[in-house]
């Protein structure tokens, strides 16, 4: 739905496990006025390996989204950011806060330096959303199992332009039952705002 709200009309969905259920639910996309085609993995290819199943005549960058991501991010803005920065790969990242339930002690050797009681840390985490140029997809070998972090690291070694897009909108990984339940609870409120 958010892809459609961002103006995206053409979709490729990679399927393997429970493929028929997914295909039966989404069909050809006509009930949403979009075009959906399926990339059927005979063997699991990973989050990046399946990109090799895309048509070879892609002319522009694409958005790649992990299937367990729910977000209000504007995908057209990601593509514009990707293009404006002449990136080969754009990784969407989300700030994630962690809190320690304990006081953290810093030492040098055996010498005490400091103590911070129950500190909070913040770091950027992979949001499972990417913008990718066709030249990156062309580097993937057919039938190669490859996940996106591996593809990104390979392209970093090749000195490709890899940038990060900060996701500030609602985002949640719904790959675990507890986070799916949380999303069920939050989504109606998020979509009303």
Language-model features and meaning:
Residues 23, 29-109, 132:
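Conserved beta-loop-beta/alpha segment of the NTase-like Rossmann-fold superfamily
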Residues 63, 70, 76-83, 96-99, ...:
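Catalytic-core segments of class I nucleotidyltransferases/pyrophosphorylases
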